[in-house]
Amino acid sequence: MAEKFAETTFTDPARIRNFCIIAHIDHGKSTLADRILQLSNVVDARDMRDQYLDNMDIERERGITIKAQNVRLPWIPRSGEYEGQQIVMQMIDTPGHVDFTYEVSRALEACEGAILLVDAAQGIEAQTLANLYLAMENDLEIIPVLNKIDLPAADPDKYALEIANIVGCEPEDVLRVSGKTGMGVPELLDKVVELIPAPTSEFEEDAPARAMIFDSVYDTYRGVVTYIRMMDGKLTPRQKIKMMSTGATHELLEIGIVSPTPKKCVGLGPGEVGYLITGVKDVRQSKVGDTVTWAIHGAEQPLRGYQEPTPMVYSGLFPISQADFPDLRDALEKLQLNDASLTYEPETSVALGFGFRCGFLGLLHMEITRDRLEREFGLDLISTAPSVNYRVIDEAGKEFRVHNPSDWPGGKLSEVYEPIVKVTIIVPSEFVGPTMELCQTKRGQMGGMDYLSEDRVELRYTMPLGEIIFDFFDMLKSRTKGYASLNYEEAGEQTADLVKVDILLQGEPVDAFSAIVHRDNAQWYGNKMTVKLKELIPRQQFEVPVQAAIGSKVIARENIRALRKDVLAKCYGGDISRKRKLLEKQKAGKKRMKNIGSVEVPQEAFVAALSTDEA
């Protein structure tokens, strides 16, 4: 049973290697992980499937990893100084998308080294760069690897040079593998053993336990499963443990490793990665980034800090049928069990009824959450236009935080601050012109540009987050034929001339269509929405004006013409005064209706008007 040596825990830390894979979406990370699982024989050939670690349907369908996964693998190196020794490798699979930077930073904290995986046909992307810098800040050992070298379009020499410039190594040090065929993967694993340092503890072996939570998932049967990386000391089943940020104590019901299915074990020692179950039903009890220690004689000092994830983008989610409101609430509660960075609060809208205002880490996070609500819980939803968190100071000097247009204070405002982000865009050099033009129309300030190689350019801009969340990414892709890659990170706030544009139907504002936009874009937004609604709202028996207004000043207007019944159909010839009398009567009726009539906006009109299909 030599192959199964990884299943026994309390391994000597010198024989442990913790690593993660940093890669952009579609650069073959999950495929490489599949090959590594096969090589180490932890998955039977009959159980193997593609993207083995991506469990959620959305992950497999979109080809992205959302939750961090971890696997404990046995490996006996075939070369190098550790040849023939039994090494336990712990691979932590990280999400590659910008919205999940916080998840990545926690997974990196649990490792000593990282494999930087780059597609040999595409080169390094903006988000990979961002995660690479995160890994460098955490002092991880970086192993650069080019993947997909079996592709006809691969150009490993060119991209090896590009990576070498960024990482600061020699081009020949960049390993070349193919996740699909498995070529070069054993050599890569030997390199991991050789280059990545073993975990070290700053305390004695019998010191109080300290473990960092890097992920937690909700299991319907067993409650919350918390994934941890042991830093110091040991944890064993039936111990009392304490979460250091909340001070809550729990009994440790089960502790184990993932190889690649969860297996119970007798406990975990320093440097090991595994899971623990306490029977708690709420993920918010085990916060990612928190420190776990013994409840009695535990550690004094938590591991170095983690902040609470803060939402960047807000959007209202409303059920199309109001009867689904309780189901939506239950669904959001269940999702929050798995996703601690999702925030929500109840909201009512005159137009859309009851719903929730949700806070997300970014656009992909928002899309995925909505997808999961619709798919896993079978809900039909309308989501309002996304908005960000503004800081508003009125003339009396009172400060408000606004992330919902309907909370925008009336009257004069002395200052408005909007969040800004630092954007890094990597584009082929022929698209630099259109990309710069797009960034300027989105109020971007150029920060600099660098040529990564002759035909790839890195552009750096500072831009308002509010301009990016709407349709910036789609527009960027269409301007660059899909070749651009984008990354953004928070960069504080700036003052801005922002106004709230209301859409009025029949003189009454419809709160779902209100938006906070820059004064220069207000006219464009007003025209766009009035024209769109004129087409979408069915004609009534009376004329309906659709107006866009800032405060009491109307900036755009369209009229929905009235439907007229032919009241003269029953008059065969005859006197004109008879016809006139009927027409006057109809006119008076229309006038009366116009005064008391209300316009019902059909659900489809909301869905269509709030969709951002403009690129």
Curated annotation (Swiss-Prot):
Its EC number is 3.6.5.n1. Its main location: membrane. It is a peripheral membrane protein. GO terms for molecular function: GTP binding; GTPase activity; ribosome binding; translation elongation factor activity. SMART domains: EFG_C (SM00838). It comes from the Bacteria. It is found in: Cell membrane. GTP binds at residues 26-31, 147-150. Pfam families: EFG_C, GTP_EFTU, GTP_EFTU_D2, LepA_C. Required for accurate and efficient protein synthesis under certain stress conditions. May act as a fidelity factor of the translation reaction, by catalyzing a one-codon backward translocation of tRNAs on improperly translocated ribosomes. Back-translocation proceeds from a post-translocation (POST) complex to a pre-translocation (PRE) complex, thus giving elongation factor G a second chance to translocate the tRNAs correctly. Binds to ribosomes in a GTP-dependent manner. This is Elongation factor 4.
